[in-house]
A protein has these predicted regions:
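Conserved class I S-adenosyl-L-methionine
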Residues: 63-64, 89-108
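Short strand-turn motif at the edge of the Rossmann-like AdoMet-binding core
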Residues: 56, 84, 91-95
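A short SAM/SAH-binding and catalytic strip from SAM-dependent methyltransferases
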Residues: 48-69
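Class I S-adenosyl-L-methionine
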Residues: 103-155
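A short glycine-rich, Lys/Arg-flanked "PGG" loop and its adjoining helix->strand segment in the class I
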Residues: 68-87
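Short alpha-helix immediately C-terminal to the canonical SAM-binding loop
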Residues: 12-16, 98
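Conserved SAM-binding motif I beta-strand of class I
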Residues: 3-8
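S-adenosyl-L-methionine
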Residues: 16-50
Length: 155
């Protein structure tokens, strides 16, 4: 059985996820309300199998790129807690964040891009887990936005 841990600083999102897990009687879901900058305090080295980054704040203002969850400083954090060969996934509607992520990964020596797509719904989904949409994903799709996806590993 896979376990899932939702991490967010916003209490309302944690509450909604926890309420859904209770209603659906999910015994493999847990939630952690914390700043992502502190993620290493909650997981031991090589404890995590996969990380999903779904529709994060793209931090588009000048000087905020280092706060993007796909910036090199976050990749360093993820690399510490991921198991060898662990996967990372990014889903976004934002082209700036998507392109920034690709550029960051190409420049990050330990990164290996396994799959990238600037419009995942224009062809059959490469990963069954992609069929589960977040609230924000559904909202962006209703507005006609394309959803971008990157799957990668940090060796």
């Amino acid at each position: 059985q896979q376990n899932f841990i939702g991490v967010d600083i916003k209490g309302a999102r944690i509450w909604k996820g926890a309420k859904t897990a209770l209603v659906q009687q999910l015994d493999n879901a847990a939630f952690l309300r914390t700043r992502i900058e502190q993620i290493e305090l909650f997981f031991t080295p090589e404890e995590v199998d996969e990380i999903w980054i779904t529709f994060p704040d793209p931090f588009l203002k000048k000087g905020k790129a280092n706060r993007r969850l796909s910036s090199a400083n976050f990749l360093d954090r993820y690399r510490k807690i991921l198991k060898k060969g662990g996967l990372l996934h990014l889903k976004t509607d934002d082209p700036t964040l998507y392109n920034f992520t690709l550029e960051t990964l190409w420049a990050y020596p330990q990164a290996e891009i396994l799959y990238m797509d600037s419009d995942i719904y224009s062809r059959p989904l490469p990963n069954p887990a992609l069929q589960f949409n977040t609230y924000y994903e559904d909202m962006h799709l209703r507005k006609g936005k394309t959803i971008k996806y990157v799957q990668f590993r940090l060796n």
